[in-house]
């Protein structure tokens, strides 16, 4: 009996070490980051991982082997689903959103992106359940003059709020968040 308990304990320890070791290993390729703002009465915090371009085609047609093909849901970062925490009384793209924490997904397109807030949090980024969507909004993109190697989220002030900028390669999606 003691031998069985010892074997089970060893297997549990090895399994946990493997799990946490793999987690740390994968996160070394896409470091975690936090972007937050309290400007213009808008309180937003985004927790995400920053994948790198690494010479890949990021946004484009599926047949061209784009990492995030046009028209397909993307986790908007790497590893776990990106989390966005919103303060009271905010609208995204003109649509009101309750205060709380959501998963942030996007659907890249050639001239616009769809931004999705999903009520399911804590999952791996590829485990998207569209039945839990609480917001879908189209936003414009702009072209950067230089390449952004690591996916980066930052904020720019606009009248009455901020634009949350999703920036990678030469593409930036502008997500208006207003009070």
Say what each PLM segment does.
Residues 51, 89, 107-111, 118-122, ...:
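Solvent-exposed coil/turn segments that connect beta secondary-structure elements
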Residues 122-168:
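Surface-exposed, gly/pro-biased binding rims or lids
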Residues 33-39, 84-91, 166:
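Short acidic-hydrophobic surface loop/beta-edge motif
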Residues 73-123:
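Mid-length scaffold segments of soluble, non-membrane domains
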Residues 39-66:
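Short extracytoplasmic
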Residues 1-4:
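Positively charged n-region of N-terminal signal peptides that target proteins for export
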Residues 18-35:
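Aromatic-capped interface at the extracytoplasmic side
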Residues 6-21:
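Hydrophobic membrane-insertion alpha-helices, especially the h-region
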């Amino acid at each position: 009996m003691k031998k069985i308990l010892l074997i089970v304990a060893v297997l549990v320890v090895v399994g946990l070490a493997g799990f946490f070791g793999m987690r740390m290993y994968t996160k070394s390729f896409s470091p975690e980051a936090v972007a937050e703002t309290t400007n213009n009465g808008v309180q937003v915090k985004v927790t995400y991982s920053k994948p790198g371009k690494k010479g890949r085609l990021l946004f484009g047609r599926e047949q061209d082997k784009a990492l995030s093909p046009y028209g397909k849901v993307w986790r908007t970062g790497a590893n776990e689903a990106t989390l966005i925490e919103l303060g009271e009384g905010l609208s995204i793209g003109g649509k009101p959103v309750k205060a709380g924490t959501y998963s942030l997904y996007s659907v890249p397109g050639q001239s616009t992106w769809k931004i999705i807030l999903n009520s399911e949090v804590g999952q791996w980024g590829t485990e998207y359940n569209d039945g839990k969507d609480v917001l879908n909004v189209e936003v414009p993109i702009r072209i950067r003059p230089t390449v952004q190697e690591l996916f980066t989220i930052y904020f720019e002030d606009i009248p009455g709020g901020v634009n949350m900028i999703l920036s990678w390669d030469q593409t930036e999606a502008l997500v208006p968040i207003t009070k």
